[in-house]
Amino acid sequence: MASRANAAGDGLTGFYSKVDELETSFIERLEEAVKIPSVSAYAERREDVFRMSEWIASEMRELGVEVTLKPLGKQQDKPDLELPPLVLGRYGHDIEKPTVLVYSHYDVQPAALEDGWKYDPWVLTIEENGRLCGRGTSDDKGPLIGWLNMIESFQKAGVEVPANLVFCFEGMEENGSFGLRKALEEEAQNFFKDIDVVCITDVVWVSDEQLSIPQGLRGIIFYLLTITGAERDAHSGGFGGQISEPMTDMVNIMSSLVDSNGKILVPGIYDTVQSVTKEEYESYNKLNISEDSLLGGTGARSLHKTQADALIARWKKPSLSLHRIENATPGAGAVTSIPAKLVGKFSIRTVPNMKSQDIDKLVQKYIREKFESLGSKNELDINCADQSDWFYESSDHWNYQAAIQATQNVWGVDPVLTCEGGSIPIALDFKQILQKNVLLLPVGRPTDGAHTINGLANGPNSINAIKLYGSYLQEAQKLWRQSNTTA
């Protein structure tokens, strides 16, 4: 899908041309960022996450952005570990322009060549088809750096950036966003006090073929289910059949939560879920989505016969996923041992009208009753480790209308308004704390493999993302002024 930005007639031709001209240097900037393995989930990589924050701050300062690194203190679950800072930035103080808060994150998921990557994940590789392969290219270093590239393009084109920008870049998004909500509350009437809207680019199109702008996200409730049977692992030959085994209980409980067709088996969980209208169903079937895109390039087997049913399952209905069962004893013995303690991990994605507190009560009650019915001698502990409610935003606001027009300007097509099956807790935090409209602006594709091996970004998409940012700010300025005139 080619860009038509240079022919958009929106007054940004010089900016668009400069983006194309600077493409090589922009790829080199991304290459430098990918080299830094800023994996927030690993304590041994924390120094690299800090190094990434300093690198971004340096790049921003070179472009004239006012930068502050806000310390977030110690990590809640690892008090000896320092949290990476929020990188806060400010570009522009013009009262004749809107002020847009841009959120992104500079940490990434773990990656290693032995995981099955085609290339070293920490070395940016350009494939023959122009796709950029490397950890963070699509999530979220690529989209983040796109904003810096946009500023540079405006500067070198001799054109003013159409809006004031406030940046909020975090380094713990892939590991619980520890400290972020508190920081937002602290800065709501300080660093963020004069913002007009929020823009988050940590989302993707509904398919490689169908451009979209999501206005809703599912919520998430994450559980740790611990079953303890002994103080240490035991040999199954010596103690099998003699002692109570945690794995037996764990498998029984985990398998009772959801069936093989994806139906959640916890009673009452669907009671408040909104029904899907006939119009919605028909519109979902009309979307231009290939089977590969619908399945995110995973090669998975779909549970649904129609595209509409698949999208409804992702956007409009809750889901329960079993993630893993872990032996809680590090370096536990042979594969035939009986684990002393197990931790089962699962999560529930929630949709509009579902309340996390109510769902948690249903889940806790169901699991405890199920465990009681087993007559087990083991001990059970249920920990709701994390929860965030669903998010839904008005697309009538000038923030969304600016993004819709910008997509038309750059890509030459009308984006469809959709929802996302994933969860971005920070979107709801921004909406609740700052009381501003929050835009979800996609610049990537579902087959980019953001959290999987061979994570990549489409080369043309990366360049058009920069153009999209600029056009979005241009349209935002126009619509903001109109809204102030008619207010």
Question: Residues of each region from the PLM?
Answer:
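Metal-dependent amide/peptide-bond hydrolase catalytic core
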Residues: 2-11, 206-208, 222-465, 470, ...
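Acidic/His- and Gly-rich active-site-bordering loop/insert found
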Residues: 2-137, 156-161, 346
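Beta-strand segments within the central parallel beta-sheet cores of soluble alpha/beta enzyme folds
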Residues: 70, 162-170, 197-199, 266-271, ...
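Short, solvent-exposed loop/turn segments at the edges of secondary structure
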Residues: 84, 119, 162, 194, ...
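Acidic, glycine-rich active-site loops and adjacent beta-strand->loop/helix elements
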Residues: 106-108, 168-177, 201-205, 229-231, ...
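Acidic-glycine-rich active-site phosphate/pyrophosphate-binding loop
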Residues: 114-127, 218-229, 405
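Acidic/histidine-rich catalytic neighborhood of metal-dependent amide-processing enzymes
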Residues: 131, 136-216, 481
